[in-house]
Amino acid sequence: MSNVIVKENESLDSALRRFKRNCAKAGIQQEIRKREHYEKPSVRRKKKSEAARKRKFN
């Protein structure tokens, strides 16, 4: 979990911006989307191999 300590004379908007930036760097949003629904291991392997194939040909 990302923590942001609000500094003296810092606006709430800038602290919120720092928090969102920290969350984006940590990949929290992508992790939430990935774990939103259960994905069978076979489907996960299939997606991984398809992504590798796309990277290879592009």
Swiss-Prot record:
Q: Does the keyword Transit peptide apply?
A: no
- Source organism, top-level taxon: Bacteria
Tell me the PROSITE patterns matching this sequence.
RIBOSOMAL_S21
State the GO CC annotations: ribonucleoprotein complex; ribosome
Q: Give the molecular function GO annotations.
A: structural constituent of ribosome
Q: Name one Pfam family in it.
A: Ribosomal_S21
UniProt lists compositionally biased (Basic residues) regions at 43-58
Alphabetical keyword list: Ribonucleoprotein, Ribosomal protein
Disordered: annotated span: 32-58
Write out the biased-composition intervals (Basic and acidic residues).
32-42
Presence of the UniProt keyword Ligase in the record:
no
UniProt-listed Gene3D superfamilies: Ribosomal protein S8
A Gene Ontology biological process noted in the UniProt record is: translation
Tell me its family: Belongs to the bacterial ribosomal protein bS21 family.
Task: List, alphabetically, the NCBIfam families matched.
Answer: S21p
Protein name (Swiss-Prot/TrEMBL):
Small ribosomal subunit protein bS21
Q: Which gene encodes it?
A: rpsU
